[in-house]
Amino acid sequence: MAKQIAFDEQARRALERGVNQLADAVKVTLGPRGRHVVLDKQFGGPQVTNDGVTIAREIELEDPYENLGAQLAKNVATKTNDVAGDGTTTATVLAQAMVREGLRNLAAGANPTALGRGIQAATDAVVDALKAKATPVKGRDNIAQIATVSSRDESIGALVGEAMERVGEDGVISIEESSTLATELEITEGVQFDKGFVSPYFVTDSERQEAVLEDAQILLHREKISSIQDLLPLLEKIAQSGKPLLILAEDVEGEALSTLVVNAIRKTFKVVAVKAPYFGDRRKAFLDDLAAVTGAQVIAPEVGLKLSEAGPEVLGSARRITVTKDTTTIVDGRGPQDDVKARAEQIRKEIEVSDSDWDREKLQERLAKLAGGVAVIKVGAATETELKERKSRIEDAVAASKAAAEEGSVPGGGSSLIHAAKELNGDLGLSGDEATGVRLVRTALEAPLFWIASNAGQEGAVVVSKVRDLDWGQGYNAATLTFGDLVQPGIVDPLKVTRSAVANAASIARMVLTTESAVVDKPEEEDSAAAGHGHGHSH
C-alpha cells in the first residue's frame, strides 16, 4: 500500500484540525447546561448522548491527516474513561487548548522538546496541588453529590449513593435494563454466582422454582463427584445433624446424582448440588474465596483430602442459601472475618500488579463478591433511546463515585483547575521555552470553565477572570449562574477524574507538538483508472 507523507507545520496543522473537530463536537456537552449530541448508528435508531467518550468513539474524519489528530484526541477520552470512568469531555477540551497554545508558540519559533518539558513540569505541579487539596469522600450524601454532578440528575445521585452505602466501596454495582418505566435499586447481600441446581428435583419451593436452605452446611469439592460410595460416609453424618447441605463441585453426575435426587424427593434430608462456576484457575480461586466466606475446606487431591475420608469438619456453613435454575446466593457465610479480610487484601494486591484489563475486571468482581454484596440498578425509561442515554449517565455516575471514594474530591465546575493553575505563576522557576510550556498549561487549564460558562450562555472569558480572583473551593455555579462556594451545594468532582484529564491531555499535546511528519495510506485510485496504468512495467 503506497503512503502519503506530510511534514512540519503542514502535518501539525492537519493534526490540530482533527483534534479541533472532535473537541468541538464534544465540548457542547460540558457543564450542567451542556447540550446533547445525536449519533447516527449503523444498526437501530439514533443515539442521543452527552457522554464525551461515546461521542468521541463514533468520530472518523474523511481527511486521513485530520483523522490522525481526531484519533489522538479520541485517545485522550478513552484513556481518561479507562482510568477514571468519567471526565472525558474535560480531558478532550484540555487537550485541544494545549495543542492550540503549543502550536502558536511553535510558529513563533519555540523549541518543541523544551516546550514538552515545561508542559510535563506544569502538569506534575498541578496534579500535586490537586492531590494536596483533595477532600476524602465518605458517606452516602457525599457520594450522592458526586453522582448527581456526573449524571446531572438528583434521583440518579441518590440511587448511586444508596447503592454504594449498601455494598461498600469495593462492592459490585451492576446496571441492567428494566422492562418497566421506573429506575430502581435491588441489593443481593452475600455471594452470588451464575450457576443453579444440577437437577430441578432439588427445588424446595415449587411456586418460585427455587431451593432455599436455612442454616445450611456447604461442601466444596474441586473435582467431579460420580461415585456415591465416596459421598456416603459424609452424607450419613450430615443426615444425623438434620441440617440441609449444598454441594458445590466441578460436576455431580451418575449414581451420586441419582442417589441425591432420590433423597431429595423422599425428603430424607434437604440437599442441593450445584456445578462450580468458571473454569481452570478462576474456578480454583473462586472455590478458595468461598472457603474463606463460609469457613469450609476445599476437598482436593493437592491438599491431601479425599472425599471418602472427609468428616463434617471440612464443611462450611451459611445462614441462608437460595438456589434457582441460574443462580446461587449464599447469605451470611459463617467463615472467620479475618480469613475474608486476608483473602480480600490478597486480591487487592493482585489487582495492583495485574497489567491485563480483563484480569483486573475479573479480580474486581471476585473482590466485590468477598467484600460486599451486589447492587443492581435497573434502569427504566419510556423509549429505547432514552433508556440508553439514561443507562450511560448512570454508568458515568457509578464510575465517578468509585473514583471519588478511592482518591477523594476537589471543587467542581472547572474551578479547581483555575485555582491549581496559580501554582504555576512563577513559571516553576524555569526559563526560556520550558517556561513557555508552563504558561501554555496555565492558559489551557481555563478551557473547561470557559466552555461550561459559554454553554450556559455566559461570556466565558469574563467568568474565568472572576473565578481567578476567588479562593479555593469557590467558583462559578453554571446551574444557578452565580459565583460562590461550590462545596456546600455539592458541586464537586472526583480527584481521580480531574487529575487523569490533565495528565492525559498533556500527554497527547506533547506528542502533537513534537510531531515532524505524518504518514497515511494513499487513497486508492478508481479501478477504471488503475486498469489503464501499470501494465507496461512488468518485463
Curated annotation (Swiss-Prot):
Reactions accelerated catalytically: ATP + H2O + a folded polypeptide = ADP + phosphate + an unfolded polypeptide
HAMAP family membership: CH60
Subunit and partners: Forms a cylinder of 14 subunits composed of two heptameric rings stacked back-to-back. Interacts with the co-chaperonin GroES.
Localisation: Cytoplasm
Species per Swiss-Prot/TrEMBL record: Saccharopolyspora erythraea (strain ATCC 11635 / DSM 40517 / JCM 4748 / NBRC 13426 / NCIMB 8594 / NRRL 2338)
Gene Ontology biological process terms, A to Z: protein refolding
EC number: 5.6.1.7
Main location: cytoplasm
GO cellular component: cytoplasm
Function statement: Together with its co-chaperonin GroES, plays an essential role in assisting protein folding. The GroEL-GroES system forms a nano-cage that allows encapsulation of the non-native substrate proteins and provides a physical environment optimized to promote and accelerate protein folding.
Domain of life: Bacteria
EC class name: isomerase
Keywords: ATP-binding, Chaperone, Cytoplasm, Isomerase, Nucleotide-binding
GO-annotated molecular function: ATP binding; ATP-dependent protein folding chaperone; isomerase activity; unfolded protein binding
The keyword Isomerase is annotated on this UniProt entry: yes
InterPro entries, per the entry: Chaperonin_Cpn60_CS (IPR018370), Cpn60/GroEL (IPR001844), Cpn60/GroEL/TCP-1 (IPR002423), GroEL-like_apical_dom_sf (IPR027409), GROEL-like_equatorial_sf (IPR027413), TCP-1-like_intermed_sf (IPR027410)
Name of encoding gene: groEL2
Matching PROSITE patterns: CHAPERONINS_CPN60
Binding locations of ATP: 29-32, 86-90, 413, 477-479, 493
Protein name per its UniProtKB record: Chaperonin GroEL 2
Region Disordered: start-end pairs: 519-539
Family recorded in the similarity comment: Belongs to the chaperonin (HSP60) family.
